[in-house]
């Protein structure tokens, strides 16, 4: 059987319409789905990212950057909305890939989505832990250092006078008491004549708050999707209220002079050469790329398709509605932030504090002075409460992808078990929750964060190309929602996502390829042999490709991805060897995807049976093991020698 055999769309639609005690409970409305999306998208990072993008890249034009990032996100959201309304099944990008790009690609995407949902939930849990510890400190409660963070994380106890002295420089933000030790803190202590060794130092052994919130969210999701949605809705109302309160309290104290110049002149280096991405229009575009990650999360709505009451109507509402709400809020936040304080003052760890302080000074003697004085505490409370809703959506998404993969035979049958009373995929929810809790307790947030970003963007690329291919292979399938200006919008979505992927550090790419290589071994060892496609008839296997149509668009899209990658790295000012390594590893992924798309669109007429060939399983397993061994060797060389030979890792 071809590795690119697709699951019949008609069969997927039929499965989505099944009812009974062993299926997921349909209880979500369009409003529930919208709140799920908002809960996944809005995080505390928006305040930090806005300040950094304004100070380093776009200036006051960060407002335009925010709009551009929203538009780029909308391109991907349109693709998800079309798929979710056409194929309303809980597998998200996995199910869409199965219907268009074939089983092997679908498995890779399903495996990749673990990076987005499970790792994403763990990242949020670690961030939640930090806010809880800080929140408790405001009430005079010091959480034990040994239970604050991942094992080996160092904390230093700073006296109030030293903390105040460090905060005056506004290059880092510290609290009196225990703070995490990092290079920036060491450097700032050196500047004032101190070192870490001058103060008490302790190491953490376990992140207890992160572990506990993961357990709580897991139990909530086992209880029921409607109960989880109601909890999420209440939390989202609190979270958005905090954002709206900042906008309302600050908008009356905007200084219009802070908007001039709206797009600051482009910076130049010591030789007078313009610096790309530092103000000017290039800075506006770079700012949009930085801010884009604040919009990630809307795709999680698609994992709840089989629990929506009317998925064909409500899925596009949930996906696009949540993105629209967040875009409006984000644009207003950026407008207020750069309006109340000069963008030159926002290159600090807590830019929101600078904006609030500037507005509070202007508000002295007014009703808003007390509100603005309380805003740091309110935002911290909003973060503690709000990150809980993000975790709910992330932990909700992963079990439903496992559920779909199990229903297709790619995972064991027990992974698709539904609780007889709550009608939730309780087995995979508990497993996901356990994985998230363990990672939250033992893994550092910096390692988790970038893996989440690259996993999400890779899924965006696949879904964008999948929309084009499905338009070609299944032109007659009913589409309640259609991506406008196809294939232009899907191709632009794939290019934008690939551009942002290419900009992530090379060590993150190495981890992605290693993760995918492990997934390939599992596929050939188990999933290929147990796939339910093997039990379909040869008639169902036949691919009905319209005569006289040549699928040019998907191939053009992949060619543009390859050209974009080459342009991004082949002509940089990096050393020659670094350019070769940077370009080659990224091209490996895109060329592999291109080969799959080519054979899918031009070679599928050869597929007449879904029968399993044991030789394919054996050869595939051997090849995947060799591939994994090779990439382990490459990764070992990379981490041992790359920084030494080329001056650091991207």
Regions found by a protein language model. Give the residues of each.
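Extracellular loop-to-transmembrane helix junctions
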Residues: 25, 49-160, 205, 244, ...
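C-terminal membrane-solvent junction of multi-pass transporters and transport-like membrane proteins
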Residues: 202-205, 414-424, 460-509, 520-562, ...
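Membrane-helix boundary/coupling elements in multi-pass transport proteins
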Residues: 89, 112-130, 290, 295-308, ...
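Membrane-interface loop-to-helix entry segments
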Residues: 205-256, 319-323, 449-462, 489, ...
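Hydrophobic alpha-helical segments and their helix-loop junctions in multi-pass secondary transporters
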Residues: 130-142, 237-269, 334-341, 460-477, ...
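Loop-to-transmembrane helix boundary motifs in multi-pass membrane proteins
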Residues: 30, 153-155, 163-165, 171, ...
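TM-loop-TM module centered on a large, flexible mid-protein loop between adjacent transmembrane helices
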Residues: 95, 102, 133-148, 265-279, ...
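Membrane-interface "cap" regions at the ends of multi-pass membrane proteins
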Residues: 1-51, 55-60, 73-78, 87-90, ...
